[in-house]
Amino acid sequence: MKEISCGRRTRVSFGKSREPLPIPDLVEIQKSSYRRFLEEGLLEVLKKFSPIYSQATRSDLRKSDRGFALEFVSTRTGEPAIDPLECKAKGLTYSVPIYATARLTDMKSGEMKEEEVFLGYIPYMTDRGTFIINGAERVVVNQIVVSPGLYFSSEYIDREEYGGYFLPSRGAWLEVILDPYDGVLYAGLDGKKVNLFLFLKTIGYEKDEDILSLYPTYLDADDEDSLLLHVGSILLEDIYDGGRKIAEKWDILTKDLAERILMIDDINQIKIVHPIAQNTFEKMLEVVSSSSEEGEEEEEKTKIYGLNEVTVVDAYLEIFRRLRPEELPRINAAKRYLHDLFFNPERYDLSEVGRYKVNERLRNAYIRYLIEVEGEDPEEARKKVYNETSLVLKPLDIVLASRILFDYFERRYVNDFEIDSYELKNLIRIFKEEYLEKRKTAPYDLRKLVSVFRRNYGVTSDLGVFAAIRYVSNINKELPSIPFDTKDHLGNKRVRTVGELVQREFERLFARAQKAIQERLTLINSLSKVSIQSLINIKSIISTVNQFFAMNQLSQFMDQVNPLSELTHKRRVSAVGPGGLRRESKVFEARNVHYSQYGRLCPIETPEGANIGFITSLAIYAKIDEYGFLMTPYRKVVNGKVTDEVVYLRANEEEEYKIIPATTPVDEEGNIIPERVVARMGEDIRLVPKEEVDFMDVSTKQPFSVSASLIPFLEHDDASRALMGSNMQRQAVPLLKTEAPLVGTGMEWEAAKNSGYVILAEHDGIVKEVDAARVVVHRTDENGNLMYDDKGNPVVDEYRLLKFVRSNQDTMINQKPIVNEGDFVKKGDPIADGPATDMGELALGRNILVAFMPWEGYNYEDAILVSQELLEEDVFTSIHIEVYETQARETRLGPEEITADIPNVSKELLKNLDENGIIRVGAYVVSDYGVGSQAILVGKVTPKGEGDTTPEEKIIRSVFGERGRDVKDTSLRLPHGVEGRVIRVDVYDQNDIAELGAGVLKLVRVYVASRKTLDIGDKLAGRHGNKGVVSNILPKEDMPFLPDGTPVQMVLNPLGIPSRMNVGQILETHLGWLAKLTGKWFATPVFEGAKEDEILRPLYEERKKRGLHLGDDENNPNGKVVLRDGRTGEPFDNPVVVGYMYMLKLIHIAKEKIHARSTGPYSLIHQQPLGGKSHFGGQRLGEMEVWALEAYGAAHTLAEMLTIKSDDIKGRNEAYKAILKNMNIPEPGVPESFRVLIKELRGLALDVRLYDENGNEIDIDKY
């Protein structure tokens, strides 16, 4: 065990491994991404569209004839005018002005003019990585999407096809497809399949010889079977016999030639066109050529037929005919259409990351291409790298992708067949003995081949035929099968951070503004008379970018329940959103945990609902590289010795390495102790010699997110319960009295530090002044001497503390100093706690003395029995701040007025209002002063419509003021069920906020703080997914008590543990008691937690010292103790597990959920009561409730509920009158929802009529 520093506290850690890499800034991903956008991204977008010519529509014009050109040189951002707190209070957006230096050039004269122009205001990120949009704090979530690039997959539609598809950042997909049953290569263009060679002709490979040369293969000149199988193939080299040429390049390999080659000793191999390429060529001729040899008696050919018969024009027209059958094929239209699809930078963009991925995927294929096609020396070729830079496709990209398909074709089928199976042996015999002699069809046209075998030899298996061909032709049969690419591998996924998301939006919108700027440029006559600012008016763009922050699916209202929930929200990664997956997607693989997520995305933390697996969290050490790929760090291992060199690897880079976990035993010098160790390699776990190990994890916390790493003994919890524990920590309400966990993981300090709510010292110094709202520190130098400026004044740092600020979820954000005057602080030390922090550590709950035992059924179904002591000591008391606002507007009948002069209101309700009619700060308000009267927060009257006033009325009005005028009381009242103290009142008019809104004269906001103590129905939880609801609050004298008389504070159900398999809570309970008894604070890092014997033996010794060991076994300690019933004093039958567990109060507070309604608002369409507390809605009577009433035969009750209590408008009015007059309630009428149904059916042109029991038609509109 070792001591570690956590904030202003020291913990005893059970961690054994050394961690050479400190935990990084957990919000840096957000901050650096947006910083890059402002510093570089903005200019990148502007440069992309520069220069803008006034005559840009005419691409044939010379530069000097293009009139004027506008280009952007640089950008800069100004300083924010208002600080974040003021923006939140006034409902404004925290933003900065952006400026661009633009240059206008007269292309004719060469004259230039440069000017800095104002582009507008753009939201600015706060120091905590958030945005303030219209007064609300928001977070832009990172999005994970499939990266642009080249991917190979196998698809079964009616049969298997291999395909490589180019996925661009913008533009159409291009697919290169190989149909193994046809033996033909296709190009998938805009969803349609065309012969690949036709497409290659349109992109630069005009001659057939050029195309066929791209696809060579080699035959063993000594292998008779292989040569005979490829009779009919096109030769790609001259063949000599002793210096005499016996065959030329482009000749056909005949049977006679094959037999002659077998007799020549000095030929090792011959180079031919790959049969698939040859077949593709022949199919192209069939498609395009009007003359076909089909149906003619086939003779053995010695020369290639149809070479260059298909022209480039034919190729263009045939492709255009296939893609646009409804249009007349014209060569210019075909050229323009194909160019725009894949080769026009304005329409098609691979993006830099897409080009990087394509180059990476084609690297090996390029080396083979250089060797086989270009004839380069293999050693020299292997040194070369495919380094294309174009962001549109290049012809060689497509050629190399099609060549890769041959590898899939030649390596996969044989592995699917048993080589020694009877069927395969039989097929091989047939091939050798009969078929090779009588061969009449191309070797790779499988459809013909299979039909021949079915007809002649009774073979039914397509795969069997193919496996035999592969085996006999002896091509690459020793090579392993190649796996296809998977979209779920993180090597093929990238993260779009906030900066990129905003930049994409900005780019999309600037493309529109470009046309407007161009139009303005055409109106210029001379440079002297024009202002560049007048040309550039992109306010619409800026306002739409602002709309992105307010409306986009990835810009979310920040989860601000506690510091952890805020931190987690900033580190969230979403697969849904624009360009991502849909929430309704049923694809299990996309949601599942993939092995490549190790150290990059947390396998535990994800929501439980429809978003499960789509929303994840970044792992602690994860980084995002310049392309958006997730990286994780590893320590390098050299010859079995772990070094301190840290290497960051992408998911696809670590595939070939052997990586060992951080828990692997290592001596002090870094040598791995076991000779053989367990290592990861790709998705496999292997036992390898230590000398073969390449890397080691940097930490045991590496795979997990911040939330998951805060769970002690995580390794003893079931994954689904750990998931709940992670999620529920984010729902913990900051408590009035905070307390850090006795049993932590050491991450509490890191989480609090990175949340932005713990104030850290910026420099070394001595605390000079401390009060509730600020801390002043006198700086010191490296030697500890106080620092003074040139004038002899002390150099001080002043830290302002947040006081009683409302969070997005109505919890309280409050900071309090944790240093005293005269304390010495070092840079980075915590000097003030925030919400839910204690001495610089995260403190989401309280350490509670718990007992695991049943108690009178009060802990049935995970319910929790708690002691009155928790209420008396304010253990789970929290403060919640709600804001209420009202506006005084200009109406048609005159202005609304905020006043204390409200008609027909008792003095009791007005006593806390000031002379302006606004409640005073400090007043305690409750929702109900009497029957139906709610506390008034802001007095407001609205004028009613009036006719002409008489002189007498005017006199009355002048004497009595508003009381003499006909006004309506529209005061802001406290909602039902709320009480608290007014802590702040903000009043704004048009002078304070310019954008107050049309017709708004005054805006008043009242902040009410309410104190929520623990109550029955409140939800409590531990950190292990152990959640429950408070069932009863028992006097502490009735609670079970320890041998020394201490009553337990909480009783939990022991049945909640075995089936849930979250045993971590038991170990935490034992260790928590040991911590309490010894006065120590423990840290048990993830996967390095304390062992059972490290806890129970010391715990027994400490309990024995205090006489608390009754019920435990000295030889085999189990941590149990004899408890006595607080009511009778009798001991319970069996010893009970007792200890300290860290419990959280969640934001699901019963008092906020309780709701009742007598009468209230109704829906306009179906006239049924609204639903939910926020709408003051009614209780839904669903179909199951109707069944229950039907089962009891309660016909009248049911009729009443379905009509007058619901949506029978006339009936409910009649019932109301009958109740007032003390009469019988009349028969119910027709529900409004039934009428709506009839109207909808009539809207569908269905004539629906109603008849009574006597056959008379009922007019439904009468009721």
Swiss-Prot record:
SUPFAM superfamilies: beta and beta-prime subunits of DNA dependent RNA-polymerase. It comes from the Bacteria. Keywords: DNA-directed RNA polymerase, Nucleotidyltransferase, Transcription, Transferase. It catalyses: RNA(n) + a ribonucleoside 5'-triphosphate = RNA(n+1) + diphosphate. GO terms for cellular component: DNA-directed RNA polymerase complex. One of its GO terms (biological process) is DNA-templated transcription. The keyword Repeat does not apply. One of its GO terms (molecular function) is DNA binding. Disulfide bonds: none annotated. InterPro entries: DNA-dir_RNA_pol_bsu_ext_1_sf, DNA-dir_RNA_pol_bsu_external_1, DNA-dir_RNA_pol_su2, DNA-dir_RNAP_su2_dom, DNA-dir_RNAP_su2_hyb_sf, RNA_pol_bsu_bac, RNA_pol_bsu_CS, RNA_pol_bsu_protrusion. Its EC number is 2.7.7.6. It holds the Pfam family RNA_pol_Rpb2_3. DNA-dependent RNA polymerase catalyzes the transcription of DNA into RNA using the four ribonucleoside triphosphates as substrates. The RNAP catalytic core consists of 2 alpha, 1 beta, 1 beta' and 1 omega subunit. When a sigma factor is associated with the core the holoenzyme is formed, which can initiate transcription. Belongs to the RNA polymerase beta chain family. NCBIfam families: PRK00405.1 (NF001616), rpoB (TIGR02013). This is DNA-directed RNA polymerase subunit beta.
